[in-house]
Amino acid sequence: MNVPETRQSSIVVAIRVRPFTSMEKTRLVNEASGAEANFPGLGDSSLILPMSNNSDSDIDIDAEEGSTRSKRNSLLRRKVIRPEGIRKIVDCVDDRMLIFDPADRNPLNKVSDQVLNSMRARATKATASSINNSNATNKFSSQRRRHGGEIKFVFDKLFDETSSQARVYKETTSPLLDSVLDGFNSTVFAYGATGCGKTYTVSGTPSQPGIIFLAMEELFNKITDLKDEKDFEISLSYLEIYNERIRDLLKPETPSKRLVIREDTQNHIKVANLSYHHPNTVEDVMDLVVQGNINRTTSPTEANEVSSRSHAVLQIHIMQTNKLVDLTSQHTFATLSIIDLAGSERAAATRNRGIRLHEGANINRSLLALGNCINALCLNDGSRSCHIPYRDSKLTRLLKFSLGGNCKTVMIVCISPSSSHYDETLNTLKYANRAKEIKTKIIRNQQSLSRHVGSYLKMITEQKRQIEELREREEKMISLKLTKYKLNKEKIQLAINECVNRVQQTYAGVETYQVAKTLKSLILCKRRFLQMVKLEVDNLILLFEREESTAAEMQPVISNCRMISGQLYNKIHELEMKFDETDTLSSVIHQVHSIDLNKLREMEDWDETYDLVYLESCLNQISELQRNEILVNSSIMTEKLMSDPGLNSRFKFLSKWLMNRTPNIESIIQDLVHIDEEFESFARTFIANPDSNFTNTNINIINTTAADLAVPAETLQRQNFSQKKVKWTSPDLSPSPMIEPQPELEPELHQDQDAIASEVDVSMQDTTFNEQGPSTPSAPTTAVPRRKMRSSLLTHQSLLATARK
C-alpha cells in the first residue's frame, strides 16, 4: 500500500459584510452632512478664553453657574452618545482588510473633546493642584479614546456589501472541488450572528443560488469530464442539530435517539442510522437539498423573520476508481461538507421567550463550544499542547476533523455593518481572527488494493471489453471527424462558389463594369484603326521616296506624312498605356483578395495549399473571361468599323488615290487630322447601348468560357498560376521588295486591303510570364498567324508601272 500524501494547510477565513436592510436604511445616520463632518479630528484641544461664550455649549464658564454648566454637559453627552439612528461600523479597505468602528464616525471621540474643553476651562483658575487634575483628565481622555478607537482586521478574503453570490462562491468554495476530486476532504461553513446572511450565502434564493447549488453544478460538470477515465460513486446525507439532537432532514421519521455520532479507527466521523442517497445528476442533488430545507427547523424572531433554529450539515461523499484495469486497484474517496450554522443570539435583542429562549440557549452553547475549540486549537502550536473540548457539543464533534484534522476548511464569516449589532460583530471578528491561526494536516484519502490471482481471468475479460469499447469509440470519433471535415469543406466550397458567382454577376450586371469593358474594346479597336492608317501613311512615304521624279515636289507632303506618322505612333502608344492602366474592372478582384479572402481564411479547415489555389484559379479564369470578352468585342467593333464608309476610306486612301488621282493627295493628308472626331462619333453608338451592339455569337462564346470555370479540384491542387501580363507588339511595317508588276494583280488591290482590315487583332498577344521567363501563351481564343510582310505595295508598284506606259 502506498504511503498517503500529506500536506500542511490552514483554515481560510473569508468575511462577508451584508448590506443594510430597508428598515435599517431608514434609520441610518447621514454621516456626510457637510465637509466638517467628514474631516477627521486631529486630537488637539480647542482654544477658549475666560468670560466668553463657548460656541459648542453657549454656557458662560463661571463658578456661579457650575450647576447650569454640568446640566448642559450632561444633556450634550446624552445627545451625542445616544443618537437617534444607527451608523455604519465596518469599512472595507480592500479585498483583505477591514476597519471596525472607524474613528471618524465614532461619536465618543466628539464627546471626549467637548468634555476636555470644559475641564480645561475650569482648570484655568486653579492652582498647581489643578494642573495635576488636568493631567489626570488627559489620561482619562486618552483611555477613552483608546478604548473606543478603531480596530483593523486582515483576513484571507473580504467581500463588501456589493459582492455577488457568484463571486463569493468562486473565491471560497470553487477551489475546493479540485481538492475533493484529488482525494482531500473539504469543509465550508458559515459562521456569524443571527440575521447576518449565513443561510442566504449557503442556500441562496431561486434567482441568486447559494454555494450549495453552485458547487453541485460545477462538481457534476467536472465528474462528467472525467467519466471516460474514472468511475464515480456519489452518496449524499443531510442532517441538522436541533437542541443538541440530530435529525435526518431527508428521512425525518427516523427517531433522534437512533442517530448517534460514531468515530471509527480511521478517524472518520459518522452518524449511525443516517440515510444516504445516491444521486445520478445534479437535478437529483437539487431536489434532495430542497427537500431537506423544507424539513429544516425555522422560526420567526425579533432579529430575523426566518431564523434558522438549528445547524444544518450537508455531506457529499465521492468515491472514484480508475477505469483502467490493472493488477492494483486505486480507490480515492473524499467528503465535501457544507455547513450552515445557526446564529448566535442575545435574549434582549431577540426577545425570545419559552421554546425560542430554550433554542437560543442551546445554539449559544454549541457556538460557545465551537469558540472554545478554536481557542484551544490556536494554543496548540509546536511548543505546547492543550486539551481540545470537542465533546462539549455535538456540533464540535462533527467538526472535529474539519477544524483540526484531515480537511481543507473555508470559514465564511457573515457580519452586519449596523451599529445595532456592535457587540456581536466585534466578537465574531475576534473569533474569525483567531480561527485563521489554526493549522491542519491534510492527507490524501487513497487506497491501493492488489487483485487476487483468481481475478486475473476477470481482469483479462474486462480489458478485452475496454479494448473493444476504445476501438468503437475511435471509429466513431474518426467518423465524426471525417463527417465534420467534409461538411466544413462543403461550406468552404459553397463560400468560394458564392464569391465567384458574385464576381461574375458584378461584371455582368453592373452598368459601370459593362461600360468599362466597352471602353477597353474601343481602345483596342481604335489602336487597330490607327495602325492601319499609319500603315497607309508609311506606304505613301515609301512610294514618294522611291519615285525620283516626284520626290522633290512632293517633299512637303512627305514631311506632313512623317509628322502624322509620328503622331499616330504616339497615339498608339498612349492607347496601349491606357489599356494597361488599373481601372474599375480590377477593383472587383482586388476586393475579393482584401475582404472576402480574409473571411474565408477564418472558416474551419481552410487549407492554403488547396482552397486558396482553387479560389485563385477561379478568379484567374474570370479575369481571362473578361479579357476574352474584351477581345471578342474589339473584333466585332473592328468589323463594324470596316463597314463604315468614312472610316474605311481613312486607311484605303492610298489605293483610291492611285487609281483615280483625285482628290489631291495634300488635301487627303490634311483631312487625316479629323480621324479622332470621326472615331468618337463611331464609338458613341457602343457607349450609348453596349449590349445591343454585340451578336448572339459573342454571348455564346462568353457563356461557353464561363462554363469552363467548373474545374475539378483535384487538378488544381498542385498547379501554379503565374501572373498574366500583356505583351504589346506592332505589325511589321517593313515594305516588300520591289517586284516587277503583273497585270493580273491589279484586282487584288482592294481585296488585300480588306483582308488586312478584317484580320482579328493579333497585335496584342496575351502571353504568360513567370519568374523563369515567357512560357507558352495561353490560348483563350483561336490563334491567328501573323503576317510577315504587307503585300499591298506590290499592287501599288504595278499600278505605277502601268500608268507610265
Curated annotation (Swiss-Prot):
- Hey, which family's this protein in? Belongs to the TRAFAC class myosin-kinesin ATPase superfamily. Kinesin family. Kinesin II subfamily.
Q: Which gene encodes it?
A: KIP3
Q: Any other noteworthy remark?
A: Present with 736 molecules/cell in log phase SD medium.
- A Pfam family found in this protein is Kinesin
PROSITE patterns from the xrefs? KINESIN_MOTOR_1 (PS00411), KINESIN_MOTOR_2 (PS50067)
Q: Which residues form a coiled coil?
A: 449-481
Q: Which Gene3D superfamilies match?
A: Kinesin motor domain
Q: Name one GO biological process term.
A: mitotic spindle organization
Annotated source species: Saccharomyces cerevisiae (strain ATCC 204508 / S288c)
Q: What is this protein called?
A: Kinesin-like protein KIP3
Q: Where does ATP bind?
A: 192-199
Mind listing the GO molecular function terms for this protein? ATP binding; ATP hydrolysis activity; microtubule binding; plus-end-directed microtubule motor activity; tubulin-dependent ATPase activity
| Polar residues bias spans | 764-773, 792-805
**Alphabetically ordered keywords of this record:** ATP-binding, Coiled coil, Cytoplasm, Cytoskeleton, Microtubule, Motor protein, Nucleotide-binding
Q: Where is the Kinesin motor domain?
A: 10-438
Q: Where is this region: Disordered?
A: 720-805
